């Protein structure tokens, strides 16, 4: 017997319980966003007393690892600051990604989001033993990208979220192939005391009641030192109902084995509880040196499943065994900033530890794959020691432990100089200990029809075990040099030299009594244990080195208007194939080459800000996953693709009371050669090299068009400052999979448009707001999948991942 055992592989061989994204709110466009090129995206704003009346506030970013006005940064960049994050009710990744036009994502639930930018997606990322992400995620100065999904950082007391589109291979390196997202926290301030809190109570249509409590305090300790403490406690209401169902497993001699889920039936069962905090200390050692240690941590418990089965009804699913995830992480970071002569010196180091414990119902997969596919007509294969047939339903017990260490030392010359340099050294090491135990329900011990034990040795009742350690190492030296050729023309040259060394070691598979293809039967030495596994059948290594360049020319048309042209390159490291005990060759890096022209402009005394970029990207030898002859995932370099697109955002202070903001992206992302089942150098599909998709096919996951629009109107009510706000997001149709067979069975995810509204008042130190998210209770399809490979299971049990239903809430807060 063989089957796929790939814990969170997206769409094409999804064989685990997929939890969909808790979307928060998304919004409906009342008119096509494309017609509003100058009506604009989120760039932070506020009228400032020092600015001209009605002017937008300057946006300060650190995207180029130095503090700059965003309008002077020749990068396609969006930033959402503290005020906009609050106004848009952003509390997590799903909330802010809606307002980033070039960003799309897939989700296996909170803490398991997989991010894509500019359409750079093959639909095969997410497996714990597969490709690294193509988008880098940063928390302050530290990378927090993990292969199983992003950290679901609670967004509160955050200075801004920065989204850098396109390859960032010079300053950010590996896994910033298609872009980088940075979460920048508010830092301690020794100049003044500050504190505040916010409370939120909300009700979800078709679901339960949720709440949030958040607070912070900035406490000066001395003239040169301060501490900042932040905490949050949030409960997100569930809205998926686990309904009653009875399934029949085929038994011997035409009989059946019933399985009733009555013990798991519950309404609104996909609730989430999140608690966390942050503590930061900032000490100014003297006039030139500052030390900032920070500790941030969070625990999150997720119940249930975030998808529903349309065949059962709206927001209904039938699962038979518990679904839970407990995710906890702590990041300890240290940033040292100073000056030596005319050089700015920065050291940024961090240590991240993350633990997840998962229980996932595997009944669907058992029914569709293990029974019907493998043993239909043989009665039942699983029996107890007395020879009686048992319920073959399985549950996955998963435990993942991550540690991530990163260190960066860089030097910068003053930004006022005609010649400017940023250079540095970087080191990163990520260790992922993977344990996935596939346990047969009531199978202790497990025996076959031949009355011999088929459990994995040492794991009674476990039909399959994955016990592996993955280590990804990355080292780099980088530099960017800019020179003002004339007062208006600046040239930049950049390069990053990198090396990577990635290993994958351990055990995956069955017992020798159950399979001769994977597991104990293929161990190097079956009598020598590896960790908690019976033996070792995998020990692979992938190494490489290279250089990613960057060339940029920037021209200042006027003090508030500039255009730029960029050539840049990004990469994603290669890795180890598990298949065949590591006998298959490692998969190689893939590369994204970017040609881009962009603009940064301000108009009408800075009442209008309009930025954008047009780009052409070539994705060479992209990594993709497919099922090999033994039904295990293989990662190969066999794809060529190109992405042509435009992304733009703007903000307009139409009047003293009315502000409009928005943005959109249009992407033409498609294959430029056939997508075949075998890796290069074989690129022509034939009978022995099955065609998965023809040249010209649209890449999956990302819509061609995505846009958003926000309008905010302020006015007085007596002594109160009041506001009305409406936000809208449109997402075009997407494919969940690149393969034509899967597309035919799953269908296309339709476009959706939804709306958010808010009314609030404020006076002195307090503010209150009534809001409704997803006001018209539209049911978007954020994701669509089958529990096992559609080529095997067909269209049995297709699941939709919905957005969160209409949510009505009240917020109240104070600041001191």
Protein language model regions, located:
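Gram-negative outer-membrane beta-barrel transporters
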Residues: 487-491, 616-618, 637-738, 811-815
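C-terminal beta-signal and adjacent terminal beta-strands/loops
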Residues: 728-739, 760-816
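Solvent-exposed loop segments that connect transmembrane elements
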Residues: 239-268, 303-320, 361-397, 437-467, ...
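Membrane-embedded beta-barrel scaffold of Gram-negative outer-membrane proteins
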Residues: 214, 335-363, 556-572, 579, ...
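Short acidic/polar hinge/loop motifs at secondary-structure boundaries
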Residues: 127-128, 134-135, 140-165, 213-215
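Transmembrane beta-barrel wall of Gram-negative outer-membrane proteins
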Residues: 205-303, 328-332, 401-407, 411-428, ...
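N-terminal periplasmic accessory domains that precede
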Residues: 93, 114-116, 138, 163, ...
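N-terminal Sec signal peptide and the immediately downstream disordered periplasmic leader
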Residues: 1-88, 94-99, 218, 287, ...
